[in-house]
Regions:
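Short, solvent-exposed loop/turn segments enriched in Ser/Thr/Gly
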Residues: 32-38, 88-89
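C-terminal interaction-tip segments
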Residues: 1-34, 96-119
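Short beta-strand/loop motifs in extracellular/secreted proteins, especially
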Residues: 37, 47-51, 101-105
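Short, surface-exposed beta-strand/strand-loop-strand elements in extracellular ectodomains
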Residues: 46-69
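Exposed aromatic-hydrophobic patches
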Residues: 77-83
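Short proline/glycine- and polar residue-rich coil/turn motifs
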Residues: 70-77
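Noncatalytic modules at the cell exterior or secretory-pathway interfaces
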Residues: 84-99
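Short solvent-exposed strand-capping/beta-turn motif centered on an Asx-Ser/Thr pair
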Residues: 41-46, 98
Length: 119
């Protein structure tokens, strides 16, 4: 259960993505539950490139696609900020940009102390 007597903490993480490979962009730490509030993927390539975004649920060992093969236009971005995704300890987000692309990702989360959650 989340401990509401302790303040939550905010964190942003940025990563230069490796093209053609799954890149872990954020992992929820032990003893925390994280609310993903913002996710940016920026295409810095002169051509349109695809991106795949996955959520890995460690409690079930399953992977769920959030975005599968979405085309990000040249010098454009994909932004998620109209809803939340809740990650438990050990859950992580990965982004796989198309081979030959140059992309960056930024994730902003609010982390809540939750001593009951561990990997």
């Amino acid at each position: 259960m989340i401990d509401n007597t302790r303040a939550s903490r905010f964190r942003s993480v940025g990563l230069n993505l490796t093209a053609g490979s799954a890149n872990t962009v954020y992992t929820c730490p032990n003893n925390f539950t994280s609310k993903v509030e913002l996710l940016f993927v920026c295409n810095k390539t002169s051509g349109n490139k695809t991106v795949q975004i996955d959520w890995h649920d460690t409690s079930t060992g399953l992977t769920y696609s959030i975005v599968g093969g979405y085309t990000v236009s040249a010098y454009n971005f994909l932004k998620f900020d109209q809803a939340y995704l809740v990650l438990n300890a050990g859950d992580y987000l990965s982004i796989t940009p198309e081979a030959g692309s140059t992309m960056d990702a930024t994730v902003s989360v609010e982390q809540y102390f939750d001593p009951a959650t561990r990997v």
